[in-house]
Regions:
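Conserved N-terminal beta1-alpha1 strand-loop-helix module at the mouth
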Residues: 1-90, 94-98, 105-108
Length: 109
């Protein structure tokens, strides 16, 4: 039996002054997904990418955008990231007051 796996390089390691280069490297390297780490400087001690950047990514690539939210109150960001073009949204259950509600929100977005 063979296992299928998806390579999802994180854009977090990119040079933020040249994100287009990082998107091109992912495309040229054959990665089907791009992992987007979202940090709010509250749930984790770093501040990274928001919905406008994901919207920009979506306009530049058709790769699967895997958005990983490391944020307080993730329910507030589901719709903005979905509208920006995220293909998958994940969150930390310990940051959520209503885990099942957020899952339903993601599914409906």
């Amino acid at each position: 039996m063979t296992s299928e796996f998806k390579l999802s390089p994180s854009i977090l390691s990119a040079d933020f002054s040249n994100l287009q280069l990082a998107l091109d490297q992912c495309a040229n390297g054959g990665a089907p997904w791009i992992h987007v780490d979202v940090m709010d400087n509250q749930f984790v001690p770093n501040l990274t990418i928001g919905p406008p950047v994901v919207k920009s990514f979506r306009s530049k690539t058709q790769k699967f955008l895997d958005v990983h939210m490391m944020v307080i109150d993730p329910e507030k960001l589901v719709e903005p990231f979905a509208k920006a073009g995220a293909d998958m949204i994940t969150f930390h259950i310990e940051a959520a007051a209503d885990t099942l509600g957020i899952i339903d929100l993601i599914r409906s977005s």
